[in-house]
């Protein structure tokens, strides 16, 4: 019971953002059946981020399902203060994203779905660009995969059995 309350308190301090709501239809013999999809991201602003995609007959139910999935799919990323460790790229389906660390005071230079992911993850200074498909679902997946594949120099040095200054050159 105490563990469940601890999970609820952790979820309550997460920032939640709704990225997209879409009406979709299923065509049946009697006509069309409409339902709604929602894409959301959650994060603690300190390197933890997750996204969720929910579908239901009503908008609030779709958003609720998406938020629950986002809370279940949280990943941790290695940030360097308020920016990224190094230049990263990510790809999912037809979407490609490019992100580059920026100096203090630059802000989040990103569009649409990528901006929402970076904001809730706690990245405050970044230069980024989305190429190819700008479908929000694919852009979010590409952004999260790029962030997950980013590693700190300390982590890479430990993996390779070298010192940090050897890694950085």
Curated annotation (Swiss-Prot):
GO terms for cellular component: small ribosomal subunit. The keyword RNA-binding applies. SUPFAM superfamilies: dsRNA-binding domain-like, Ribosomal protein S5 domain 2-like. InterPro entries: Ribosomal_Su5_D2-typ_SF, Ribosomal_uS5, Ribosomal_uS5_bac-type, Ribosomal_uS5_C, Ribosomal_uS5_N, Ribosomal_uS5_N_CS, Ribsml_uS5_D2-typ_fold_subgr. GO terms for molecular function: rRNA binding; structural constituent of ribosome. GO terms for biological process: translation. Keywords: Ribonucleoprotein, Ribosomal protein, RNA-binding, rRNA-binding. It comes from the Bacteria. Gene3D superfamilies: 3.30.160.20, 3.30.230.10. With S4 and S12 plays an important role in translational accuracy. Located at the back of the 30S subunit body where it stabilizes the conformation of the head with respect to the body. Part of the 30S ribosomal subunit. Contacts proteins S4 and S8. This is Small ribosomal subunit protein uS5. It comes from Colwellia psychrerythraea (strain 34H / ATCC BAA-681).
């Amino acid at each position: 019971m105490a563990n469940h309350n601890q999970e609820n308190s952790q979820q309550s301090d997460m920032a939640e953002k709704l990225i997209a709501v879409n009406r979709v239809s299923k065509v049946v013999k009697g006509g069309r059946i409409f339902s709604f999809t929602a894409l959301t991201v959650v994060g603690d602003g300190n390197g933890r981020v997750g996204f969720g995609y929910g579908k239901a007959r009503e908008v609030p139910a779709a958003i609720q399902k998406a938020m629950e999935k986002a809370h279940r799919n949280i990943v941790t990323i290695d940030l360097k203060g308020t920016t990224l460790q190094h230049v990263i790229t990510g790809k999912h389906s037809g979407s490609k994203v490019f992100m580059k660390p920026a100096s203090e005071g630059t802000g989040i230079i990103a569009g649409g779905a990528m901006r929402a992911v970076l904001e809730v993850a706690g990245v405050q200074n970044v230069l980024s660009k989305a190429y190819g498909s700008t479908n929000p679902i694919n852009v979010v997946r590409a952004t999260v995969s790029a962030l997950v594949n980013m590693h700190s120099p300390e982590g890479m040095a430990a993996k390779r059995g070298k010192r940090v200054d050897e890694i950085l050159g």
